[in-house]
Amino acid sequence: MRQHVNPLSRFFQLPLELPAPHELFEHPNLPIHLDIGCARGFFLLELAAMQPERNHLGVEIRRPLVQAAQHDRDRQEQHNLHFLFCNANISLEAWMAALPPDQLQLVSIQFPDPWFKQRHRKRRVLQPALLLAIAAALHPGRHLFLQSDVLAVIEPMVALVELSNCFARPKDDPQPWRSSNPLPVATERERYVQEQGQPTYRVLFERTQAELPALRDLEMAWQQVDNSKDAAPTPHG
C-alpha cells in the first residue's frame, strides 16, 4: 500500500540544491526524461535500460524509496539513470531553469498520491508554479505525460495544464483519454490496475509556442475551476 506524506510539512518545505546533469550522468549532454514521483523506481530502471539514448531522472518525496531505487541503479551500473529525493514543488524549478536549452524533452507524472479533495489542493504534486517551470523548460514539441487510475486526481491536473494554454494534445490523439501508454514500460501501479481490469486515464500534452501566463492569474483560474466543481449540486435519485 502506498504511504502518503504531507508535502506541506516543514521538513519537506526545505529547498534542496539538486546536482547538475554532469554530477548525475555519465553522458550529461544527452536529452533528459524527468519522472516526477517515481516511487520505488522500477519503471525507470526498466525504461533506462531500453533507452540508452536518453538520461532519466526520477524524483520522489519518500526518501527510503529513493535510497532503494538508487541502490538498484548502482548495482546494475545504469549510468543514464539517477534518483533524487526532493519535494518537486520546492526544489525542481531552479534545477530545470539551469538546464541547457532543450535538454529536458519529456516530463512524466504517473499515478501521483490522490490528494483529490479541494481542501488538499496545495498538497497535489502538479501545482501552478511547477507546471510553469516545466513549460519554461520544455521547448515547443516536447511532451508532458500524465496518467492516473483516479479521475478525481487526473482531472484537476488536466484542467490546470489546459488553463495554462502552454500545451495542446497532439493532433489526432484520442480524447478525453488515451487508451495506450506512449511509453514502452508500464509502472507497477499501471500493471496492477490492468490486472484488476480497471481503467487508466492518460493524457499526452505537447508544448506549444504560447508564452507563459502570470503565475497569479493561473492560480486564480485554477482555484475558480476547483471551487466550481465543489459547488456543483449533487444529483438526487
UniProtKB/Swiss-Prot annotation:
GO terms for molecular function: tRNA (guanine(46)-N7)-methyltransferase activity. S-adenosyl-L-methionine binds at residues 35, 60, 87, 113. Keywords: Methyltransferase, S-adenosyl-L-methionine, Transferase, tRNA processing. PROSITE patterns: SAM_MT_TRMB. Its EC number is 2.1.1.33. Pfam families: Methyltransf_4. InterPro entries: SAM-dependent_MTases_sf (IPR029063), tRNA_(Gua-N-7)_MeTrfase_Trmb (IPR003358), tRNA_methyltr_TrmB_bact (IPR055361). Substrate binds at residues 117, 149. The active site is at 113. Pathway: tRNA modification; N(7)-methylguanine-tRNA biosynthesis. GO terms for cellular component: tRNA methyltransferase complex. It catalyses: guanosine(46) in tRNA + S-adenosyl-L-methionine = N(7)-methylguanosine(46) in tRNA + S-adenosyl-L-homocysteine. It comes from the Bacteria. Belongs to the class I-like SAM-binding methyltransferase superfamily. TrmB family. PANTHER family: 3-DEOXY-D-MANNO-OCTULOSONIC-ACID TRANSFERASE/TRNA GUANINE-N 7 - -METHYLTRANSFERASE, TRNA (GUANINE-N(7)-)-METHYLTRANSFERASE. Catalyzes the formation of N(7)-methylguanine at position 46 (m7G46) in tRNA. This is tRNA (guanine-N(7)-)-methyltransferase. It comes from Synechococcus sp. (strain CC9311).
